[in-house]
Amino acid sequence: VQWTAEEKQLITGLWGKVNVAECGAEALARLLIVYPWTQRFFASFGNLSSPTAVLGNPKVQAHGKKVLTSFGDAVKNLDSIKNTFSQLSELHCDKLHVDPENFRLLGDILVVVLAAHFGKDFTPDCQAAWQKLVRVVAHALARKYH
């Protein structure tokens, strides 16, 4: 994947302002609420019976932070995202058997969360760069499935 200097700047500039714990928890919670069938991968998380339960679930919050923290590795390694996520791809494919479509869904939700948090700063150009990034990350995570 080729990144322009502008795309790199838009991604890293916004990433520097992201509250990883808050945005990560919100993104994962939204995934579980908007696409409830994804909850089957999180049966060990306890009560996911309602949006309120999901939003208040400490395991959702902790895992959301973990997910977005690892997403930060993509931001730091834009030119080697496939390598950066090869172990996570193996884990999610071989051990967890996660449907790779869920990576795309989570990426799209992350874009929604960033738009909600950053408003006018999340310009169409910024959105395009982030949409490209989440697509590349989803593809890297799905790599072991192919």
From Swiss-Prot:
UniProt record similarity statement: Belongs to the globin family.
GO BP: any one term: hydrogen peroxide catabolic process
Subunit comment: Heterotetramer of two alpha chains and two beta chains.
A single Gene Ontology CC term: blood microparticle
GO terms for MF: haptoglobin binding; heme binding; metal ion binding; organic acid binding; oxygen binding; oxygen carrier activity; peroxidase activity
Entry-linked Pfam families: Globin (PF00042)
Protein name stated in the entry: Hemoglobin subunit beta
InterPro entries hit by this protein: Globin (IPR000971), Globin-like_sf (IPR009050), Globin/Proto (IPR012292), Hemoglobin_b (IPR002337), Hemoglobin_oxygen_transport (IPR050056)
Globin domain sequence ranges: 2-146
Endpoints of the signal sequence: none
Residues annotated to bind heme b: H63, H92
Keywords assigned: Heme, Iron, Metal-binding, Oxygen transport, Transport
